UniProtKB/Swiss-Prot annotation:
The active site is at E88. Pfam families: TK. It comes from Escherichia coli O6:H1 (strain CFT073 / ATCC 700928 / UPEC). It catalyses: thymidine + ATP = dTMP + ADP + H(+). ATP binds at S9, A10, M11, N12, A13, G14, K15, S16, D87, E88, C89, Q90. One of its GO terms (molecular function) is zinc ion binding. This is Thymidine kinase.
Amino acid sequence: MAQLYFYYSAMNAGKSTALLQSSYNYQERGMRTVVYTAEIDDRFGAGKVSSRIGLSSPAKLFNQNSSLFDEIRAEHEQQAIHCVLVDECQFLTRQQVYELSEVVDQLDIPVLCYGLRTDFRGELFIGSQYLLAWSDKLVELKTICFCGRKASMVLRLDQAGRPYNEGEQVVIGGNERYVSVCRKHYKEALEVGSLTAIQERHRHD
């Protein structure tokens, strides 16, 4: 039986690397995979999933208007698909998460989704909210804060490196705009208005 998986984490936990490895494992066994990523995120070039360690794969793009079930069913009818993998799945809509559950339930194709659980305000993304609700399997990919604790929160930094938690939910950036930290240091950095000051304080504790 196929299942819907949600692999979630903070930033820089190796989500894209894990996706590419999963896709490779299927392909190595002669199975066909289809990879999707969000059209909104083109940091590494449109139409591909890239990891920070240099791996990459071509990918189909989705936006809020994409009919994922229809697309996948049409492609599956032409040539069998053995697994669908979705990067940046936090950008999925409620309807698209439902459609991916239909890919699993109606077409019997496993769907592996990789993305962030929460945004820089500590709020759930819509896609993540429904994946948490409807997935068969939830898997946390762990990364660590500068203090060594598990990083579960994402800080957004302005151009001067100051953390803030207001503004639009989606601003695409890499390491220079976002950093993963534990909950304690997320709260402290916002309170003090400086991640650097918190890091310095931690070094001297």
